Curated annotation (Swiss-Prot):
GO terms of biological process kind: bacterial-type flagellum organization
InterPro entries for this protein: Flagellar_biosynth_FliO (IPR022781)
Stated role: Required for flagella formation.
Record keyword Glycoprotein present: no
UniProt superkingdom: Bacteria
Transmembrane domains' residue ranges: none
Keyword line: Bacterial flagellum biogenesis
Gene Ontology cellular component annotations, sorted alphabetically: membrane
Protein name (Swiss-Prot/TrEMBL): Flagellar protein FliZ
Lineage of source species: Bacteria, Pseudomonadati, Spirochaetota, Spirochaetia, Spirochaetales
Length: 208
C-alpha cells in the first residue's frame, strides 16, 4: 500500500513537471516570435533597439526556474520523509515479530541475586532459576496439556493476593498436584531447602 502511494506521488509530480516544461516551451516560442517581430529593419531602428536593450536589466535566474527549484526541494523533502517513515515502521514491525518469539511470562525475585523466570521461547515454555553467575533450567513444559495447566495457574496467581508469595509460586507452578505439601510447615521446609541450595551454590561459585 505504501509503495503504491509513493509510486502515485512520483507519477503525479512527473506529470506536473512535464506539463510545466511544455508550458515553458510554448511561452519561450511565443516570446521568440515576439522578439523576431520586433527586430529592426532599418538602420535607425537598429540603433534605437540597441539603446533599449542596453537599458534593460539582466536577470540571472528566471522566476519559473526559481519556482522549479523550490518545488524540487519540497518534493525531495516530502519523498525523504515518506521513505524515513516507511523504514521506521518496517523496523518496528520486524522488532515486534522478533519480540513475540521470546516472552517472559513470570518474573519472581527471590533475593537481590536470584530470581525465577518463566519464559516462552518459540511456543516452548521453560522455568529457569537465574542467579548472578548461573542460569539453571528447572522445568520444561513440553505437552499442550501442561502448557494450558500452566496458563491456568498463572491466571490464578495474577488474581491471587499472594502474587509475590514464595510458597504460591512453587505451589502453583513448579510442583505437581500430588507433590504439593499439605501443611504450612512443609512449605517452610521447602523454602528453607531452596534457600540453602542457593546459598550453597553461591559459596561454590565464590570458591571457584
Amino acid at each position: 500500500m505504501n509503495n503504491k502511494f509513493l509510486f502515485l506521488v512520483f507519477l503525479s509530480f512527473f506529470n506536473f513537471f512535464t506539463y510545466a516544461n511544455s508550458q515553458e516551451q510554448v511561452n519561450s516560442a511565443s516570446t521568440d516570435l515576439e522578439n523576431e517581430s520586433s527586430l529592426p529593419i532599418f538602420e535607425e531602428d537598429k540603433a534605437n533597439f540597441v539603446n533599449n536593450d542596453s537599458t534593460q536589466p539582466v536577470s540571472i535566474f528566471n522566476i519559473s526556474d526559481l519556482l522549479k527549484i523550490v518545488l524540487f526541494l519540497l518534493i525531495a523533502f516530502f519523498i525523504f520523509f515518506l521513505l524515513k517513515k516507511l523504514i521506521f515502521y518496517s523496523k518496528k514491525s520486524k522488532y515486534e515479530q522478533n519480540s513475540n518469539l521470546i516472552k517472559e511470562l513470570v518474573f519472581y525475585e527471590i533475593d537481590v541475586k536470584n530470581s525465577i523466570r518463566i519464559i516462552n521461547i518459540l511456543d516452548n515454555v521453560y522455568i529457569f532459576l537465574v542467579s548472578s553467575n548461573s542460569f539453571t533450567l528447572l522445568k520444561e513444559i513440553k505437552s499442550e496439556e501442561e502448557l494450558e495447566d500452566l496458563k491456568l495457574r498463572l491466571s490464578k496467581i495474577n488474581d491471587s493476593a499472594k502474587k509475590d508469595s514464595f510458597q504460591s509460586i512453587f505451589k502453583k507452578m513448579l510442583l505437581k498436584k500430588e507433590e504439593i505439601p499439605s501443611s504450612g510447615n512443609d512449605y517452610v521446609k521447602l523454602e528453607e531447602k531452596i534457600e540453602a541450595s542457593l546459598k550453597d551454590k553461591q559459596d561454590r561459585l565464590k570458591k571457584f
